[in-house]
């Protein structure tokens, strides 16, 4: 399964939404829209997963050698061919997410691609 994982960069997180449940976003930033400009791409590549729950298990508990971020957690975004998904306290929510606004830390080798 081809995926990308994005995680919030604390230096750009002026509203303190890292690890925040989706339902509380508007309390901290006046909207539930995802601010892609505070996210860093931390993984891009093929993961041996069938679905989002497998992605969670791999990147939260098992790990992946090319993953550059912390374990997958609340507020992280997983992008698949079907769209972008917000990792929430119980599962994933499909969201609008503008990948063009994200940051790709240097040096960046693109994971498995």
Locate predicted features:
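Extended boundary segments
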Residues: 1-47
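Residue-level detector of intrinsically disordered/flexible regions characterized by low predicted structural confidence
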Residues: 6, 103-106
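Short non-domain terminal segments
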Residues: 14-17, 26, 41, 57, ...
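Short, conserved turn/kink motifs that form compact alpha/beta structural patches or helix kinks used as
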Residues: 27-79
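Short, compact, well-ordered microdomains
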Residues: 68-103
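Short acidic DE-rich linear segments
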Residues: 106-113
